[in-house]
Curated annotation (Swiss-Prot):
This is 1-deoxy-D-xylulose-5-phosphate synthase. The keyword Magnesium applies. Its EC number is 2.2.1.7. The keyword Membrane does not apply.
Length: 630
């Protein structure tokens, strides 16, 4: 079948099961081929082909609302709703988004990217439906990994209490990105082998009612003691106790079983949870056999061999530099522990776990819990290293404020994927952390210019015992600089001069330092002498350095790959105003006040005007022509 000709999912209703099975194979072949060129979330989507087709066959999108938790498993949904022809632009600048996007299609009713939000949003939609007295189905699809998130459990509690009509699809593939952890995961494991409780209960009730004269009374009594029946028939009754009708487990790759179960769910009043067992990566051997999460999301790959197509890497990944330094320090300090919220692979903590299995804690998709747990460990003299993506640290903001900073606890936060991350787009760009951390009392915030300085700042963080300290580091690889054999402490709040200059100064840090250095070099050749400052401590700033710099009364340009509002440049301006430098000429370059979409980092930097050319032009506008040398 030519998938690019699909306009909407209505054609599915006229297809036989054998035709749907052929369609499943066509979609898998399409995904494997297309994603081999663009990269993307291949394994999650291969696992939900039959489930997605079954949902679109039995329900009527967009009237009926599908909410894809996290959203990376929505590719099949996109194909069935007329977007197959756009897949060669997947996750590229101005191309097809890798997550549901309301502006892309009327079938995308809820945008996602972070986990565990679908149930709360679905509850909102269901309540709105009931108030408006309409009759659409609301169907959140949530994975067993996302179900470990506290927000999902809060929503389950509320939905079950209100007895709201809703069909929750639990897509259980035993993995989020890496293998799942936690007691709830174990409950689901027991349910996978428990059989179909609901049908057994209904069949028993039907048989009892057939008994002459007393059958109805016996059936009523049986209903009253259904809790006992549940415990006899099912080894885990978690969802039933929350007020849901539990259906399953059902094979998520068997159309007959899916249709039977979903039809039953459609007829059931109140909240229903359909437990669907799927195989992540199904149909492509390299992805299907992956047990650690390598094939969750990938770049381009060779279909035949399963080898990834990567540029030759001459420098280590930033995540590896940080985690390897922590691992080395853990060998000499038994107080060091590493904590991750379900990202051991992305944060490069596999080697740490192999060497220190009892000192590496994966809490699952539970950023709030991870953060406060780290605080609790710090109260007992441990040295927790919390490795967390910038975009996911947003989810634990109150815990950083209330539990870590307020108590001034020695927690080292590794803020991975800081800055622009590219293809994952708006929901994953790490551009807000400076603004939401800089104003917090007690915290130290750093970002290195290269991986050698990075290892020294990790060492500095582990030696620091005066409160919380955080290190930002970007996605991707370092610069390939030589690495010192010995670690050293970099004094807190100190900056360094990377290039001397007398006519203007560029103050920046991290990923924008190469841009600043190149701009200063070009300006120098044009007769403009520009100082470049490595502001590696975003907080506290180097006040002595700033006093000296502001005292020279030369134009200052701050650059940051982070949002301007509340950012580092704002801090420099605040310092100048508070200390009476009212004539100082300070301008800022950074991320403007809108969400940055998906695309390559290079293309996104061009869009927002954060390039070497733009820096050169800005410095020229800041320096009066009469001050420039010929």
């Amino acid at each position: 079948m030519d998938l690019t000709q699909i306009q909407n999912p209505s054609f599915l209703k006229d297809m036989s099961i054998s035709e749907l099975e052929e369609l499943s194979e066509d979609i898998r072949k399409f995904l494997i081929e297309e994603l081999s060129q663009t990269g993307g979330h291949i394994a999650p989507n291969l696992g939900v082909v039959e489930l997605t087709i079954a949902l679109h066959t039995l329900f009527d999108s967009p009237k009926d609302k599908f909410l894809w938790d996290v959203g990376h498993q929505s590719y099949v949904h996109k194909i069935l709703t007329g977007r197959a022809k756009e897949f060669r632009t997947l996750r590229q600048y101005k191309g097809l988004c890798g997550f549901p996007k309301r502006c892309e299609s009327e079938h995308d009713v809820w945008e996602t990217g972070h986990s565990s939000t679908s149930l709360s949003a679905a509850m909102g939609m269901a309540l709105a439906r009931d108030l408006k007295k309409t009759d659409e189905y609301v169907i959140p699809i949530i994975g067993d990994g996302a179900l470990t998130g506290g927000m999902a459990l809060e929503a389950l509690n509320h939905i079950g209490h209100e007895k709201t009509d809703m069909i929750v699809i639990l897509n259980d593939n035993e993995m989020s990105i890496a293998p799942n952890v936690g007691a709830l995961h174990n409950v689901l494991g027991r349910l996978r082998t428990a059989g179909k409780y609901q049908w057994v209960k209904d069949e028993l009730e039907y048989i009892l009612k057939k008994i002459p004269a007393v059958g109805g009374k016996v059936a009523a009594t049986a209903e009253k003691i259904k809790d006992s029946l549940k415990y006899l028939l099912v080894s885990g009754v978690f969802f039933e106790e929350l007020g849901f009708t539990y259906l399953g487990p059902v094979d998520g790759h068997d159309y007959e079983k899916l249709f039977e179960t979903l039809q039953y769910a459609k007829k059931t009043k109140g909240p229903v949870l359909v437990h669907v067992i799927t195989k992540k990566g199904k149909g492509y051997k390299p992805a299907e056999s992956d047990v650690i999460g390598t094939w969750h999301g990938t770049g381009p790959y060779k279909i035949e061999s399963g080898d990834f197509v990567k540029p030759k890497e001459v420098a280590p990944a930033w995540s590896a530099v940080v985690s390897e330094t922590v691992r080395k320090l853990a060998r000499v300090d038994e107080r060091i522990v590493a904590i991750t919220p379900a990202m051991p692979v992305g944060s490069k903590l596999e080697k740490f776990h192999q060497e220190f299995p009892n000192r590496m804690i994966d809490v699952g998709i539970a950023e709030q819990h991870a953060t406060t747990m780290a605080a609790g460990m710090a109260t007992q003299g441990m040295k927790p290293f919390l490795a967390i993506y910038s975009t996911f640290l947003q989810r634990a903001y109150d815990q950083v404020v209330h539990d870590i900073c307020r108590q001034n606890l020695n927690v080292f936060i590794g803020i991975d994927r800081s800055g622009l991350v590219g293809a994952d787009g708006e929901t994953h760009q790490g551009v807000f952390d400076i603004a939401f951390l800089r104003h917090l009392p007690n915290i130290v915030l750093m970002m290195p210019k290269d991986e050698n300085e990075g290892q020294h700042l990790v060492y500095t963080a582990m030696q620091y015992e005066d409160g919380p300290i955080a290190l930002r580091y970007p996605r991707g690889n370092g610069l390939g600089v030589p690495m010192d054999d010995e670690f050293k402490v970099i004094p807190i709040g100190t900056w360094e001069t990377l290039r001397e200059g007398t006519q203007a100064a560029i103050v920046t840090f991290g990923t924008t330092i190469p841009m600043a250095m190149e701009a200063a070099e070009r300006l120098g050749k044009a007769g403009v002498s520009v100082k470049v400052v490595n502001a590696r401590f975003i907080k506290p700033m180097d006040e002595a350095y700033l006093h000296d710099l502001l005292g020279k009364n030369i134009p200052i340009l701050t650059i940051e790959e982070a949002c301007l509002i509340g950012g580092f440049g704002s801090g420099v301006m605040e310092f100048a105003a508070e200390h009476g430098y009212h004539s100082a000429l300070i301008e800022r370059m950074g991320i403007p006040d809108y969400f940055i979409e998906h695309g390559s980092v290079t293309k996104l930097l061009e869009e927002i005007g954060l390039t070497t050319d733009a820096v050169v032009d800005r410095i020229h506008t800041m320096i009066p022509s009469k001050q420039k040398r010929a």
